[in-house]
């Protein structure tokens, strides 16, 4: 007979405190060490999920060469606009902003999100060259264009994206080229690439201990009293306080989460070819370009998802599998 296992909870304490995210736009706290010149992330909108048939390309798999059913996620990728450039220097207190430059022509809808810089107060590109020696990082300030999608909103999301490159001067030269222009998903990623997805998960509201932490339901006398779905003990008499490790009811969902090493199966420019009959549930038709990612992606439909170059990519042994079929049948349940 083995030792009795203790299981006070199923959820990890590493994610505590489990509270609502402050913003719908996820924070990007780390970047890939990539010397390729270009943006290292791209914001998209989640349309929905479907399934695909892939040709298994793992020679050691019993299904090698055969069609394999795989769930996939479709993300709409409207072009983003580069509104500004910001330079950072590395200090003992972390990265500190040196200066920033905004494009001459800014979208009027951007004023719904932030206060636009007046024309006479805008800095020129010379301000960037003046602090180039101090700069250690170059980032682009981009905003989405949700009005081109089926999402009923005009206010764009603003995301700060790091520009990769072998040197700061090379990154800054690229930043000057794209300032004020629009970029497509094909300018950043390509089919077969391994990426990470960052997004705010689907919110569940205030939930009890059983659903939130997976604790055991108490049967017998407790259940007959109507208290079977509560934490049996929340701690000893002393210390006279409730420890933060106790599984208690509270907010569940609407947290920022990062999923690593997702594969891009397909990029496309015509949304009609991927939209299922009747449109995606709670989303509708894809009107812009799209990207198909293998597996699931966190968050509900219409949620902003940031695709980032992989920071933990392992060796890609098998490469991009052949996509034999992507389902566009109705998701309406008919």
Curated annotation (Swiss-Prot):
One of its GO terms (cellular component) is cytosolic large ribosomal subunit. The keyword Repressor does not apply. Belongs to the universal ribosomal protein uL3 family. It comes from Methanococcus maripaludis (strain C6 / ATCC BAA-1332). This is Large ribosomal subunit protein uL3. Part of the 50S ribosomal subunit. Forms a cluster with proteins L14 and L24e. One of the primary rRNA binding proteins, it binds directly near the 3'-end of the 23S rRNA, where it nucleates assembly of the 50S subunit. The keyword Secreted does not apply. One of its GO terms (biological process) is translation. Disulfide bonds: none annotated. Keywords: Ribonucleoprotein, Ribosomal protein, RNA-binding, rRNA-binding. InterPro entries: L3_arc_euk, Ribosomal_L3_dom_3_arc_sf, Ribosomal_uL3, Ribosomal_uL3_arc, Ribosomal_uL3_CS, Transl_B-barrel_sf. Residues 1-10 have a biased composition (Basic residues). Residues 1-20 are annotated as: Disordered. GO terms for molecular function: rRNA binding; structural constituent of ribosome.
